[in-house]
Swiss-Prot record:
One of its GO terms (molecular function) is translation initiation factor activity. Residues 617-632, 794-901 have a biased composition (Basic and acidic residues). Its main location: cytoplasm. GO terms for biological process: formation of cytoplasmic translation initiation complex; translation reinitiation. This is Eukaryotic translation initiation factor 3 subunit A. Residues 339-523 form the PCI domain. It comes from Aspergillus niger (strain ATCC MYA-4892 / CBS 513.88 / FGSC A1513). The lineage of its organism: Eukaryota, Fungi, Dikarya, Ascomycota, Pezizomycotina.
Length: 1052
């Protein structure tokens, strides 16, 4: 049953538009909200519900009702997501566009207000010039003197910015984890990122990142839901990666490094889930942003490692593009300048890695190694490296790839000064111009401070190898850097204290004497006491520091090692048996190792087989368990879906029943109210306040209305009758009094009309005279111009006539030319048509001739065919005649044989009488006696045939000859069936001289008729002559059927 008309979406939309037209937008929003969130709306068609939703979101944006919009959009998504996803996208896009438009309008309004305030400020009126600085103005200036723009934005723009942010968050919540709305979800997320970047909303950006992160985490949790996203799908994962890369770019632009690092972790997690390799252009962006993050966090080691990975990716992309194995869309476009810049940054970042640790805690004394190890492992995984990077490994990799040749010259010189030819006494002089060049580049300027730390570390390490103590002034002179990168003595002392705290330096500062003393106690070396102190350093290799000479501490520490080596060499030369014993022990160990290797190998193989079997068994059990679990889960899901479907169906039915009942009650109440209102407004005298709606019905209201209308009609008739009587008397009195004043009024009217006529006539005459005078004056003025006008008109006419003649002649020439061309065209066309007609006539004649020839050929063929058929027919006729003759001869022979057999049968009584040979008759095919024979009753067919032939006689015998007694013809057997002509129906009068020809065929006579024709049929041995004593003349002709009464008449 369709919903009632007043709850259709079209009617709701019309009602809302009417409320908006009268300025009641909140009421219209309430109407739309109630309709959208109603359960009845689920059965409405989407095509009629979409305009309602568009108007609904428009009103929500205008009135800033975010919560109402969220409720309505959630309901609309649940209704339309299974039928039409496009309409959801249309509504949500409209929602976002309206919110963005409101923000733009608010900004324009704020700019207008600010410009008006700025323009009005200089020209403001001051009441008292001596009291300009009142306490109120001072307080206002203190509080908001320079904040007028901010206050305007907070009052006008900020509420709409908040609403726009709520819009983005609402749309993302509606679209989350829905595979059918995934593209719209990603598009909205990108728009939200641009919103945060455009308006520098850092707090909202953090919340947005957390929101998207929660959505991805919940995707696996709700994977069993309908339309859930599948991160295993490559396209879905690619869209999420694109969104995260945009998130990373915006985080870097907003300088939210913590969020950028978390975005990097999100990207790494998604990349680990992806089955297809990421594009080189995406990974280049990934490593570039990761390098910037590490640089901001002052983690120069991983910053250099990220730049190294970035350079490797650029080199691979350039090689792929050069080989034609990739596209420019998937690989970043790289030029030679880009490669040089990247190589310079890789080398410079590697040089900026601190030689000693820059952290504030001491690794050997505080248990932070495990935490630092876990952190380094995480960062290594983000870079996709197998092991944590080190300074030496990065330099080795850079040298192997030839980065020194690609890098800029000043970077190459810097590498040679710091890593190849480091001289502490001239380091600052050599490096000053290089630092100036690096400082002039804004991108490289940030590496100056870590380079200074590396230079100071190298400086103090090599000074400690050469000197035991140096003056502070000497150190300050050595550590001179160019402006503006100059470092102060306090900075140098702070660096020394930090190195000593970490155990990387062993230096004492004596401010009284102004001397730096390097620790020379051979048993108190910080490195010797705390060998794990380098755990937190970026440099853990022993040979990384350039060794000018061994320090006393190293000499003391390595003394036992040198002594052991010397004694070992001495023993080898002094006692040869010592070397032999060593060799024998070595050979014995090798033999034992070889003997045990095979056994160990077999045990290893057996253990491997056992492990593989256990793994296979565990895998099979796990797969079986997973399949069983999936089966149970699928069955449970199906049961839940069926139960939910049944529950929804039952609820829908109950709701429909309740809705129909409620609608019927509501319609009835509305109809009653409508009738009461009509009764109240249309009929007077009825008090409806005392009526109860529950006790009323339509019939009672109709009766009340009719009764009241009848009452009013009677009252009206009475009033009309009374009023008409009063009006008649009054009108009669008025007319009687009026007759007295009519003549006087007529004379006055005539006088007024005459006066008006005279005034009008005088005015018309005066206007005519004035116009005449003006016309005469104008004629006198213009009469002086008549000669000039005539001459000018004559000249113009002559010129126009000459031009006309020229154009006429030209037109005639053109006409003649076109006429001749047309004549030629017509002649050509006629000639062509004539040729076509002749050609057509020729083709027609040829076609007729061909048809005539074909007809003649067909006729000849037909005549030939007829002739052939006639010849064949004649041949067939001759053949048929020949066959007929043969058949006649065969028949004659059969008849003769039959006659002989009959004669032999009849010759049993009188053997001496031999029957004469019957004349040959036309032979016919034998007839079969199909009637059954029982007990010898009735003659056989041979007997009947013989009787027939005997009854027929021979035509050659003379008619007057008397037959011999022995040759008396037997009485013919009565035959049935057969037509007797009228001239043969006389019976006894028929003469036997001209018997009728015997029929060539014999009809079948049923047994019953044969028995009915003769009560005592002749036996098989009875002769035809003994069956009847009647003369031959009284018998009918043989072969013809004679009725029984005819036979009886003939017998009589």
């Amino acid at each position: 049953m369709p919903p009632p008309p007043h709850i259709k979406p079209e009617n709701v939309l019309k009602r809302a538009q009417e409320l908006i037209a009268v300025g009641q937008a909140p009421a219209a929003l309430n109407v739309l909200h109630e309709h959208v969130t109603s359960k009845r709306t689920r059965s409405s068609p989407i095509a009629s519900l979409e305009p309602v939703m568009l108007l609904f979101v428009e009103l929500c944006v205008d009135l800033r009702k975010g919560k109402a919009a969220k409720d309505g959009l959630y309901q609309y998504k649940n209704i339309a997501q299974n039928t039409n996803v496009g309409t959801i996208e249309v509504v949500l896009k409209k929602f976002i566009e309206l919110a963005e438009k409101k923000v733009t309008e608010a900004q324009a309004k704020a700019d207008e207000i600010q410009s008006s305030l700025e323009s009005a400020a200089p020209s403001s009126n001051v009441d008292d010039l001596e009291a300009i600085e009142t306490p109120e103005t001072i307080l206002l200036a203190t509080v908001s003197g320079e904040q007028s723009r901010d206050r305007t934005d907070r009052a006008v723009v900020t509420p709409w910015l908040k609403f726009l942010w709520e819009t983005y968050r609402t749309v993302l919540e509606i679209l989350k984890n829905n595979a059918r709305l995934e593209v719209m979800y990603q598009t909205t997320a990108l728009q939200a990122f641009q919103f945060c970047l455009k308006y520098t909303r850092k707090t909202e950006f953090r919340r947005l990142c957390e929101l998207l992160r929660n959505h991805v985490q919940n995707a696996a949790k709700y994977s069993a839901q309908m339309h859930a996203i599948n991160l295993s799908d490559p396209d879905t994962l690619q869209r999420h990666l694109d969104t995260r890369f945009q998130q990373l770019n915006v985080a870097v632009e907003l300088e939210l490094w913590q969020e950028a690092f978390r975005s990097i972790e999100d990207i790494h997690t998604l990349l680990s889930l992806s089955k297809r390799p990421a594009k080189n252009v995406m990974m280049a962006n990934y490593y570039e942003k990761l390098a910037r993050i590490f640089l901001v966090s002052e983690n120069y080691l991983f910053h250099a490692a990220a730049f190294s990975r970035y350079y490797n990716l650029l080199r691979q992309s350039a090689a792929a593009l050069a080989a034609g194995q990739g596209t420019k869309k998937e690989n970043p476009s790289v030029t030679e300048a880009d490669m040089t810049k990247a190589a310079s940054f890789v080398l410079l970042s590697a040089l900026s890695i601190p030689v000693i640790s820059t952290s504030r805690s001491r690794g050997a004394l505080v248990d932070v190694d495990e935490v630092r190890k876990n952190k380094n492992t995480r960062l290594t995984n983000l870079l996709g490296m197998a092991s944590p990077p080190t300074r030496a490994v990065l330099f080795k990799d850079a040298l192997n790839k030839g980065l020194l040749k690609r890098a800029r010259p000043e970077i190459r010189d810097l590498y040679n000064i710091l890593e190849v030819d480091f001289h502490p006494l001239s380091i600052c002089k050599k490096i000053t111009p290089i630092l100036k060049q690096i400082g002039a580049d804004p991108e490289m300027e940030k590496y100056v401070l870590p380079l200074q730390q590396v230079i100071l570390t190298r400086l103090f390490q090599q000074l400690s190898q050469v000197y035991e103590s140096v003056e502070l002034k000497f150190v300050y002179e050595l550590a001179q850097f160019p402006d503006p990168f100059q470092i102060t003595p306090s900075m140098i002392e702070k660096f020394i204290m930090n190195g000593c705290k970490k155990g990387d330096l062993a230096i004492r500062v004596d401010h009284i004497s102004g001397v730096l003393t390097f620790d020379t106690d051979v048993f108190s070396s910080a490195k010797a006491l705390h060998p794990g102190s380098a755990a937190g350093s970026a440099e853990s290799e022993v040979g990384s520091v350039q060794r000018l000479q061994n320090t006393p501490a190293e000499i003391a520490r390595l003394q036992l090692t040198r002594l052991a080596k010397t004694l070992h060499v001495t023993c080898m030369y002094v006692d040869p048996s010592y070397n032999e014993a060593r060799l024998q022990a070595k050979r014995a160990a090798l033999a034992r190792a070889e003997a045990g290797a095979a056994k160990e190998h077999e045990e290893t193989l057996a253990r491997r087989v056992i492990i593989e079997k256990k793994k296979e068994a565990a895998t099979d059990a796990l797969q079986r368990k997973q399949r069983e679990e999936e089966t149970r889960k699928r069955i449970r899901t199906q049961q839940l879906q069926e139960a939910e479907k049944q529950r929804l169906l039952d609820e829908h039915r109950e709701r429909e029943k309740k809705r129909i009942k409620d609608e019927q009650d509501r319609i009835r109440q509305q109809e009653l109210k409508k009738q009461l209102e009509e009764l109240k407004t249309g009929v007077k005298g009825i008090d409806i306040s005392e009526l109860d709606l529950n006790e009323l019905d339509a019939n009672r209201l109709r009766a009340m209305k009719l009764a009241q209308l009848e009452k009013e009609k009677n009252e009206l008739n009475d009033r009309i009758r009374t009023t008409a009587k009063r009006i008649d008397h009054l009108e009669r009195a008025f007319r009687r009094e009026e007759l007295k004043h009519v003549p006087e009024d007529y004379e006055k009217q005539k006088q007024r009309d005459m006066e008006i006529y005279e005034a009008t006539k005088a005015e018309a005459l005066k206007e005519a005279e004035d116009k005449h005078k003006e016309a005469v004056a104008l004629k006198h003025r213009l009469s002086r111009l008549v000669p000039q006008f005539n001459s000018f008109r004559k000249e113009v006419s002559e010129k126009r006539h000459e031009e006309f003649e020229k154009r006429r002649k030209a037109a005639e020439r053109d006409f003649e030319a076109k006429k001749m061309q047309r004549i030629k065209e017509v002649q050509e066309r006629r000639r062509r048509e004539r040729a076509e007609r002749e050609e057509e006539e020729r083709r027609r004649k040829e076609e007729e001739e061909r048809i005539r020839r074909e007809e003649e050929e067909r006729t000849a063929k037909e005549e030939e065919r007829r002739r052939v058929l006639a010849e064949e027919k004649a041949k067939r006729e001759e053949e048929r005649k020949r066959l007929d003759e043969l058949a006649a001869k065969q028949k004659q022979r059969e008849e003769e044989a039959e006659a002989r057999r009959a004669a032999r049968r009849t010759g049993g009584a009188e053997p001496e009488a031999a029957p004469e040979r019957a004349a040959p008759t036309e032979r016919t095919a034998p007839r079969l006696n199909l009637a059954p024979r029982t007990g010898g009753a009735g003659p056989s067919w041979r007997e009947r045939q013989a009787a027939k032939e005997a009854a027929g006689g021979t035509p050659a015998a003379p008619a007057a000859a008397a037959p011999e007694p022995a040759r008396e013809e037997p009485a013919p057997v009565r035959r049935t069936g057969g037509y007797v002509p009228p001239h043969l129906r006389s019976g006894a009068s028929a003469t036997p001289a001209a018997p009728a020809p015997a029929p060539s065929t014999e009809r079948y006579v049923p047994r019953a008729m044969r028995e009915a024709g003769s009560s005592q049929p002749p036996s098989r041995t009875q002769t035809p002559g003994s069956s009847s004593d009647k003369p031959e003349e009284s018998k009918p002709a043989a072969g013809k059927w004679v009725p029984r009464w005819k036979q009886q008449q003939g017998g009589q």
